[in-house]
Amino acid sequence: MINYKSYKASCSKGTDSKPFLFVIFYITVVSNAYLFNVPCFHFIFKEEHTMLEDMKKNSNLTFTENGAVTNGTTGSDCLDLFSGIGAFRYKSDGEIIKSFIKAFTENPDMAMKILFFGRDVREGLGERKVFRTIISWLGNNEPKSIIKNIEYIAEYGRYDDLLSLLDTKCEKEVISFLKVQFDKDIDAMNSGKAVSLLGKWLPSVNASNKETVKTGKRIAKVFNLTDEKYRKSLSALRAKIKIIENNLREKDYTFDYKKQPSRALFKYRMAFMNNDNERYSEFLANVSKGKAKLNTNNIYPYELIEPYLSTSFLHNEQITFTEAEKETLNATWASFPDFCNDEDTLAVIDTSGSMYCCSKPTPASVALSLGLYFAEHNKGKFKNHFIEFSNKPQLIEIKGETFADRLRYISQFNEIANTNIEAVFNLILDTAVKGNYSQEDLPKKLILISDMEFDYCVENANETNFNNAKKAFEEKGYKLPNIIFWNVASRNSNQPVTKNEQGVALVSGVTPRLFSMVASGELSPYKFMIETISNKRYAKIVA
């Protein structure tokens, strides 16, 4: 305890006030660090190496599938969750829940914010399956954390996410929430006012899927409605919402394409081509001329690439498109928002064999789509270029006027090689040294889009690839560019760096929205996570 009166008296006698100011500063930093659970002293004091810390560091070292030294964890369970949640779709439910339990135990509030960031379809990663798996676990094991956030689940995702909480300890609260919203929508509809999207996502009692029918009947019963009354109510709500499925079922193609949601426009594009080609082509032509807008908010770049690249890349087949497909693909791709800035950044894409081993979407399609997107939208000197991993990395210049042309062009460079990250670093460093280029000539950032299963480092197999690269650049008088490790298939939860590494960010997922998030300032993994989930959008999410 500080005796302020005694200290003030000593100051009046000419005692130096600097120690007191330092104590006040120390207390301020400690209190803030405690509130936000942020490790803050690494920038004030030099970290002391103890036997315990060194044992932790050594026991954390592990190997990638290709024999490279890497880290088993970042040193923060929350950061492990944050850095991988966008790539968890290939994991089993048990593995997903295991990762979340660790993070939730470390910091419940932070884990919940990461969870909702992972689901957020508008400003986050848009991961549906992972979110539903975790909230189902929470519903049985931490029901209070679900009840506090029930009203936000549909806001960040969809109303049918709530159905994952049936048969959990939160079922009563979920049913009550759905019933209140259902009644509000019925009243609003009868008054000619706008309604929510609940009617679109509630299960039908006359669907073709037996499980959907079973759940629909269950909802109707707890809503105190007969199956017939429930069915008619949903039909009326869906007519009010004007969901396009009603039109397609009735073969009614009088709807306005400009007013359709992005997911529906993409999902039913073949039906439009086959049954309403003249009007649909006219709409696409107007999009190309800037006279109409094609919404792409809930579409991801890999969805345009997956049907064409997954097979052709594996079997060296040529990509072919019909003219109608070309029109649709070109208009959709050109309508994606631009999330890139004018920084000199270069993407590096992993198309090794392991990137084709998972179910759809294949990680290779995700990586290629993001690489192509970023190369096109890059405004720096590396515009329209990306690198593919290999023993001899390929720097590919993208050519072609339209998306279809460019997609067909990059498919000719398929090698399905290995993930030699050391060779990528050497390509950049050797070019800089031989050409006597300045630091300013190098890329400011490298975005490494991969499953993180890198090859072992030939130069020093006892070090991580990142540490080896950093040393190699320093020895030649250069600084390693900032690195964005972008995970698209987290099979083994390896971490290329730990939480406080400077000049690095750890991200994951399929959305190009992340490009805008990693565009600013100095990076470190933990700091980047804190900045992301401290966004006011997630302030209301608590455990």
Identify the residue ranges that each predicted region occupies.
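Short, often N-terminal, low-complexity regions
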Residues: 9-10, 17-20, 34-36
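Low-complexity intrinsically disordered segments
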Residues: 12, 24-25
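Low-complexity, intrinsically disordered or signal/transmembrane-proximal segments
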Residues: 4-7, 26, 34, 42, ...
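Long lumenal/extracellular ectodomains of secretory and single-pass membrane proteins
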Residues: 39-366, 376-543
